[in-house]
């Protein structure tokens, strides 16, 4: 009986120790993302968004919404924030750049978060919500997105020590 309890506790500990299902490669990528930002809130926001949006790079392209890269940045928004003309050639070039250049993808995610940070005066729930829904941040979709980002950041701190 004692053997069963020990095995059960080990299994229970293992199943909760990686509740986000992150691999060693995912952790390397997350540490790289973390190194590209200065503020802790920005570091955790970026890591959580990468997990939520692309499963840390496993889903880099969403052609139905035109979102690309680790952070699923919308191509029209990226072109606008980079002051680049919206043409099919530029969309393709920058979509590929978002998918292949972690630094570029991270810089664009930071630009987007900083834009919403200014709009929402450091209210991170609204910032995360707007990252996903724009000015529809009061929507259920936005709220649930922000809530999931908060939960992921908690798990990154508590379970993974990131």
Model feature map: region roles:
Residues 4-14:
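Sec-dependent N-terminal signal peptides
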Residues 18-162:
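Catalytic glycan-binding domains that act on GlcNAc-containing polysaccharides
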């Amino acid at each position: 009986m004692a053997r069963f309890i020990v095995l059960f506790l080990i299994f229970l500990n293992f199943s909760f120790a990686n509740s986000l299902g992150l691999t060693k490669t995912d952790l390397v990528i997350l540490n790289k993302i973390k190194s590209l930002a200065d503020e802790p809130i920005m570091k955790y926001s970026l890591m959580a968004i990468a997990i939520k949006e692309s499963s840390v790079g496993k889903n880099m392209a969403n052609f139905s919404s035109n979102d690309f890269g680790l952070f699923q940045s919308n191509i029209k928004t990226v072109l606008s924030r980079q002051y680049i003309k919206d043409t099919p050639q530029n969309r393709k070039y920058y979509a590929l750049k978002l998918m292949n250049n972690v630094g570029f993808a991270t810089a664009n995610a930071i630009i987007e978060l900083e834009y919403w940070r200014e709009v929402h005066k450091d209210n991170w729930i609204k910032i995360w919500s707007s990252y996903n829904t724009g000015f529809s941040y009061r929507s259920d979709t936005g709220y649930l997105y922000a809530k999931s980002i908060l939960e992921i950041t908690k798990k990154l701190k508590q379970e993974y020590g990131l």
